[in-house]
Regions:
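N-terminal Lys/Arg-rich, disordered targeting/topogenic segments
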Residues: 1-10
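Hydrophobic membrane-insertion alpha-helices, especially the h-region
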Residues: 12-29
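Generic structural hydrophobic/aromatic packing signal, biased to beta-strands
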Residues: 34, 41, 67-75, 113, ...
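FKBP-type peptidyl-prolyl cis-trans isomerase
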Residues: 37-46, 108-112
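Short extracytoplasmic
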Residues: 42-79
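Flexible, solvent-exposed loop/hinge segments and secondary-structure transition points
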Residues: 78-89
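Elongated, amphipathic alpha-helices that form coiled-coils and helical stalk/scaffold elements used
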Residues: 88-303
Length: 303
């Protein structure tokens, strides 16, 4: 029994059908409708070359693997667990940033900052080659750099200063070091008055080394790793600083001591003002008495 012959048209139809099926299956990797809020790096098949897309619209993907990076994103460091009263541990996927102050107080900064990606091909290709994905970039570069920078800020202030006058400085320090590199510092020892005991004590404090040739006028231990990839950071926000139990107690005691000093000075000033007032009132009374005496003498003479 002879096999039925397959016509050329049938063969072409089968081939065309297979091609159509393949095209349908590959349609998602042939073209990409790029989102303008993202940068894309596409690794082309066979050659392995990178193609970067930084503007939106339909792009030829050619079956390559694409990797997406938001042009700007917010990085949070907010996760903190209180394991016991006044005892905190950084936890979760976005751990809070720890630091130790120059008075040996300890705390965790809870906050966020914004990362802006480069828009040029060279930097995006380098980022893709070195990290391979946005997730890896955040985990292996952005967050470790943040934690290193925050740690370097601790010795620049006391725990009490971080509560009050230098908290805005802390934001500036973090922003500057993220973009320009960690400060070069020297340790100086100053004789200071303990706010609680009133006694003199030696306290070590880190002082930033000035350098007019460096960014912001400060010498750097190293350049920021972000500068190697054209990444910039800004909008640093400190939502809260959680201090461990011992540090919080020390801060509260210092506040009470400062308040007591202010109260004492206020009372002393009030006493001085009262003394001045009494003196002035006495003078006024003496003047009135003298006037009355002169008045009586004048009346007696005219009689």
């Amino acid at each position: 029994m002879s096999q039925p012959k397959v016509s050329k048209s049938s063969i072409f139809a089968i081939i065309a059908g297979v091609i159509v099926v393949l095209l349908v299956c590959m349609a998602g990797s042939l073209f990409e409708d790029a989102d303008k809020s993202k940068n894309y790096v596409c690794q082309m098949p066979v050659t392995g070359e990178y193609v970067v897309w930084t503007d939106g619209g339909l792009k030829w993907q050619g079956g390559g693997n694409k990797y997406e990076y938001f042009k700007t994103s917010q990085i949070e460091f907010v996760d903190l667990t209180e394991v016991s009263e006044g005892n905190y541990v950084a936890s979760g996927t976005n751990p809070a940033a720890s630091l130790t102050f120059n008075d040996k107080g300890k705390g965790f900064i809870i906050g966020s900052f914004r990362v802006v990606m480069p828009n040029d091909d060279a930097n995006m290709k380098k980022i893709q080659q070195d990290f391979g994905s946005e997730k890896a970039l955040i985990a292996n570069l952005i967050k470790p750099t943040l934690y290193k920078v925050v740690t370097s800020c601790g010795p620049l202030m006391s725990s009490l200063e971080s509560v009050s006058e230098t908290r805005t400085d802390l934001i500036a320090y973090i922003t500057d070091q993220l973009n320009n590199g960690v400060y070069k510092t020297v340790v100086i020892r100053d004789s200071v008055t303990n706010e609680i005991t009133g006694e003199k004590e030696m306290r070590a404090k880190a002082q930033i080394v000035a350098d007019t040739n460096s960014p912001s006028g400060y010498k750097r231990q190293e350049t920021s790793p972000f500068s190697q990839y054209g990444i910039t950071c800004g909008l640093v926000s400190i939502l809260d600083i959680k201090y461990d139990g011992a540090t919080q107690s020390q801060i509260d005691a210092q506040k009470q001591a400062n308040l007591a000093v202010i109260t004492s000075k206020t009372k002393s000033l009030e006493a001085i003002q009262r003394t001045v007032q009494i003196t002035e009132e006495g003078r006024a009374a003496a003047e009135r008495a003298k006037w009355e005496q002169e008045k009586e003498k004048a009346v007696a003479v005219t009689k």
